Amino acid sequence: MVTVNRNYLKLPGSYLFSTIAGKVSAFQKENPEARILRLGIGDVTQPLAPAIIESLHRSVDEMAHQETFRGYAPDLGYEFLRDAIAKNDYKDRGCNISADEIFISDGAKSDSGNIQEIFGADNKVAVCDPVYPVYVDTNVMAGRTGAYNKEKENFDGVIYMPCLESNGFLPEIPEEVPDLIYLCFPNNPSGAAITREKLQEWVDYANRTGAVIIYDAAYEAYITETDIPHSIYECNGARSEEHT
């Protein structure tokens, strides 16, 4: 007999951003003159840069001719793109990351959700609070959490690390040792950024305890300060072989 993954039943309702969209839509209908500042889902507000438009047009034109037509890309992504990422996003910042360690995907949301599948269901998860919902929801569906606690409005069995004004909206090392630590900087949703010194403390902690940090740097392009790392690999020991 076919059964369902009952972990899905722990989720309290719809995806957070769908709920927000529904509430905004209802409010607009009741208040058509109101100006709404959308600070929920991070939708884009500006047109694509000319360089991107030119590249898209050029790529479409290539697909119109037999000599330049391309079928499926390699499973890990085009080599020229991986080489460019390795050089510009990593090596130019002193990170020892080579092209064969880079995988082209459809974005951080999918990767954040998919990477947890390689870990066992008995791993303890730590997340910032507030948190990007994907980190928690995917682990709920994988069976790494307890039930949803309506009173606390969070899930039992998850280590929540409060990010408050009093601690600069940065998580502090938890008392309970986690196995998987989700960090996102610049942070979604708070916008807080972490210094290289503070991030190094997390890397050192993970190496001491054997934890794995899942680091989401989707918003690194907003960084302008020199003491704010664009990648966790700017920290010593972030790669496992550097520690061992």
Give the label of every model feature segment.
Residues 2-106:
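N-terminal small-domain helix-loop-helix segment of the aminotransferase-like
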Residues 31, 208-209:
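Helix C-cap/helix->beta junction micro-motif
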Residues 36-37, 179-181, 211:
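Generic beta-sheet signal
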Residues 66-206, 220-239:
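Conserved core of the PLP fold type I
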Residues 214:
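Generic enzyme active-site microenvironment
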Residues 217:
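Walker B catalytic acidic pair
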Residues 241-244:
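Conserved small/polar residues in nucleotide/adenosyl-binding loops
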